[in-house]
């Protein structure tokens, strides 16, 4: 039987990309043109997004979708559908806006009043002239931060609504925390309530059911499923601090909180008689509120999962389709309220794939730490590099429903400076971190240029690099096919910081994550619920001390980011693991408090003594990678440190793959690698991007900037290609250069260049398109095997030698095999396509530099 990797090389692989196609009511002629372009780019699935469509879920929408379905059948395409009139999901096509109050979004708010006593018959007006939906819920009186019993009376107005609170304030300073429910929020007020099952059902009734009614005959056939885009609690938008982090953490003093009757019922049951007295701690970060904050977030995020994600996923699966999408993970919102969903693993729990999203230059090749300005704020690049993709791939590994599948929405809103070279870098970034499905963002059928979140693929033939877009899509399909259907090797379980952060001070995961991946130590992020929810997670500790598994995914140790608080289930696991000889590490500090248990329920938290954390080893974050490397946890061991090398080990159907990626855009990697046990890395090195023959690999790793490869361990390959030391001649010119604008094959008059330089700053300012270089060179003697090396290129290159095409390269290394060449003169033609930002400005590129244009060289013939 042919090995699977050989089948992939021979063209038998699965589709793993489903780009957005924005639907705004365009003509069927335009839609047909775009679907043909999509299918022609080795893409076999597409996700339709109303952006917005003028008649979403109306006759115009159904007419357009029937046309799309007919076209897709002819082209061999399958469909996904974004599940609302516009993003973010939750508008329910306007249904929530017209719904009765109990089906609309509800939040819990408070106002604090200071009363200097003793004061008899102190009075507080309960009416809010700015919010007619606000209703009195309850009051807690406090002195010196502790609840006190104060009798009070509530007087109603003529309509029967509470209007005034009257009480006798005791001596001293008394704070009255008056709590209200409200239907008014500052963000997406007309959206469904994510913690209310009946409210979420409005989305099903308004969008999902009409699609089934009109197109149900195509469910599970042409229509594969639905896509939720960036749903969240939407209790507020929140603000972002100078560190690039959202402020929507539970305990924020001014935050309205998600609320529903079911949330109230569960919260009352969990808190018992202390219920009302504990609620004020939802708006502070004091240790005494750790228990109630954790209980609230635990309930709210669980209800989000049950009411929203599970309900939609169950509806889809019952009708033969799948449910996918992503929430907002940015700015550490994945563990917070606001635009977030509180707990990433629960937020995507009902989906058939995990999902994440990268946008607006949140990745910058060569910059993996620090803050990057994007014009309206800053991004914490350590999070986007080392945590964001791993959230998704970890959920895919841990949830059996997902079968190892994780989707990433990629390329969107970077700006026109993002070309195929950076897109390939982004694709590798996700692939080597375990992501194996992609939603490229986006095909826009609006008139060019469309200012809505470029770049756009094809763009009515005005995106010149679209000519080679299919090469990137084929590469992503091939690589993702190899990295699907098996299991990644992730020896480290990194504890998800959400629970600890809800309770008190906690370090983010990204500091530990960056130390691990920069040392080629792979990991999954594992939530605390894995150690407490036996219904969803099966945890087994190996009796021989070799490690433990969660739902079949094997780990050798647990690493806890530094935190003040920990839960009892994690402590219990640490004790059992230590007894079996499995290491549990805490970074930089040991937890000293519990947020759960009987004592925490009474006092707000429970202090931990040394015995309680004796099974946890304290370790500095800066020592983490070396400690784990010394115990054999590296995916590969390099002869010297390689902080820009990323490595993934993947086992599939008896085959073992190593994906190796150089993530530095300027520096090459040259090293010797071995497996952690000292075994030499030997096998066949695959070039899935350019389709060259598999090369024999003996552990000597050479990767140019932007370059990646997959090594099939134990397989055989051909001889290595020519190296830079084999130079035969240098092509010095002169060069004749002509320009062709996008959408045309015609070239203008040539200009002569004495040397190679940036064309945008000299002969062709403000131009984006194809630059055709012509030159000749003389080979002094015949060569049996030659390679053309173009040096620096911006940014795609197609080479023709003596009238024969040598192919296209969309990123470094720009090397082309030319086989045997006779002595004498040879004609060289090189077509270079730059990026559209040189001709079309956009707001997303206002904080991003422009690359040069053209061929910078040096151009060498190797052989």
Q: Model regions: which residues?
A:
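Carbohydrate-binding surfaces of carbohydrate-active enzymes
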Residues: 7, 13-22, 27-33, 45-51, ...
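Acidic/aromatic-lined carbohydrate-recognition and catalytic surfaces
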Residues: 48-166, 177-201
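Short acidic/polar inter-strand loop motif in beta-rich domains
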Residues: 184-186, 717-718, 833-840
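An active-site-proximal structural segment forming one wall of the substrate-binding cleft
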Residues: 199-225
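Aromatic-lined ligand-binding clefts that engage carbohydrates, nucleic acids, or primary amines
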Residues: 777-779, 783-802, 809-810, 828-832
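A glycine-anchored, Pro-Gly-centered beta-turn/N-cap motif
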Residues: 817, 822-824
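Exposed low-complexity, polar/acidic, P/S/T/G-rich flexible segments that act as propeptides
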Residues: 840-863
